[in-house]
Amino acid sequence: MPTWSRTESFLRDWQSLSPEDRRKFKKAVKNFVADLKTGTFRKGLRVKGIQGAEGIFEMTWAKDGRATFEYGPEVRPKNPDIVWRRCGSHSVLKKP
């Protein structure tokens, strides 16, 4: 099971999400975690690196819902550590 943390930016973004958007994000994270175990992300999550932001990735959780993350140092051996950086609309990609 992966470990995870959230940046202050993520926490601010989270507070601005509607309850429906929070539900959608949580559903996408369940799929994301399942895919981490297999090593291949499903196409619907559209996980990819962000150009110009080395080591930072984006995930799509709704039509205009994006989250950014990076891998942190492993807390538990052989379990990835995910640092959630931002979540919100496509605009979060401007400052991932």
Positions of PLM-derived features:
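Arg/Lys-rich, positively charged N-terminal/basic patches that mediate binding to nucleic acids
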Residues: 1-30
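Enriched for short, Lys/Arg-rich terminal
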Residues: 1-3, 12-15, 57-96
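Noncatalytic linker/hinge segments flanking ATPase motor cores
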Residues: 2, 23-24, 43-48, 68-71
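Residues that form or immediately flank small-molecule/cofactor binding pockets and catalytic motifs
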Residues: 9, 52, 89
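Generic secondary-structure microfeatures
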Residues: 18, 29, 33-36, 54, ...
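A short beta-strand-loop micro-motif that forms or neighbors metal/cofactor-
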Residues: 26-31, 77-81
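A short, surface-exposed loop/turn module that caps and links secondary-structure elements
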Residues: 33-59
